[in-house]
A protein has these predicted regions:
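Alpha/beta-hydrolase superfamily serine-hydrolase fold, recognizing
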Residues: 2-320
Length: 320
């Protein structure tokens, strides 16, 4: 006999997921799993899965290299999107995207598998992401690391360390870059640049041409994934413009790339973020890239479109 606890829905975030009374989470929008390519794919990009801690894993990417074994490459620590509650580095959408980005930009990528809400509500994803970044930075020290990775040791250029992400992953990249402004990374490693692609920010007050209808799912998602957030939807982690937020001039990097799409409900916040950084007194270089006629995550779902290719080209240029 099926227990009533297993079929009673206690919360839902449609069309994304349902949570049942017994703690089971049913996800509807996860994309299929894609295996790594330890022997390389058609572009010569190698990939492998590693464990950083018992709770945190990652997929690493290495581009096709010249015969020189000492070739040093920029490093991108990447955080996937999915509203903090779906997707992973091992999904076909993420894997395909990063394979292309690595082949074009010739970088090492560490794609972080942070734990997901609602089983692990925020700030767990932020904590996992910071721990993963510290693990990467630990390769930039003379101290022996028992879990060091040979790709990072042999080929990583720690003077060209980047963070990046899409949607909620861009939110993580922003918050981790802010944390790096106050907390020291191993080896005093510095973040060279950050890219935020269609970043997931929100707030109680409308900005620009935002509408309440567009914001409803964004707000509901935040309250599901971070139910104990102080200030709710105006917590500084989701609303970097809210009262009490740290000044954006404290973001710890030299270069910043922000991408927005004209049909994305997050577009107004992305543009506002770009302007706020410029006006904050931050000393780095910030660039805004607008994609016309496209919606949220277009480059994942229409992978072969000219605009998706243009975005990847712009990111590759930023990361090189």
């Amino acid at each position: 006999m099926v227990s009533s606890n297993s079929i009673e829905v206690v919360s839902e975030l449609l069309p994304i997921l349902k949570v049942y009374k017994d703690g089971t989470v049913e996800r509807f929008l996860n994309s299929p799993y894609a295996p790594p390519s330890p022997l390389g794919n058609t572009t010569g990009v190698l990939s492998k899965d590693i464990a950083i801690t018992p709770d945190i894993s990652a997929r690493l990417y290495l581009p096709k290299l010249s015969p020189s074994a000492n070739q040093k490459l920029p490093i991108l620590v990447y955080f996937h999107g999915g509203g903090f509650c779906i997707e992973s580095p091992f999904s076909i959408l993420c894997h395909r995207y990063l394979n292309l980005l690595v082949s074009q930009s010739k970088i090492i990528v560490v794609s972080v598998d942070y734990r997901l809400a609602p089983e692990y509500p925020l700030p767990v994803a932020y904590e996992d992401s910071w721990a993963a970044l510290q693990w990467v930075a630990s390769h930039n020290t003379t101290t022996k690391n028992t879990k060091e990775d040979p790709w990072l040791i042999r080929h990583g250029n720690f003077d060209r360390l980047y963070l990046g992400g899409d949607s909620s992953g861009a939110n993580i990249a922003h918050n981790i870059a802010m944390q790096a402004g106050t907390d020291t990374l191993h080896g005093d490693t510095k973040i060279h640049g950050v890219f935020l692609s269609q970043p997931y920010f929100c707030g109680s007050k409308l900005i620009g041409n935002e509408s309440l209808a567009e914001k409803r799912l964004l707000q509901d998602t935040w309250m599901l994934v971070y139910p104990n957030a102080k200030g709710g939807i105006d917590n500084p982690m989701i609303n970097p413009f809210a009262y009490g937020s740290r000044n954006l001039s404290q973001i710890q990097c030299r270069r910043l790339f922000v991408c927005v799409a004209s049909k994305d409900e997050l577009r107004e916040r992305g543009v506002y973020y770009y302007k706020a950084v410029k006006e904050s007194g931050w000393k780095g270089q910030v660039e805004l890239f607008k994609v016309e006629g496209e919606g949220h995550g277009f480059h994942f779902f229409d992978f072969d479109s000219e605009k998706a290719k243009e975005l990847v080209n712009r990111l590759a240029s930023f990361l090189c």
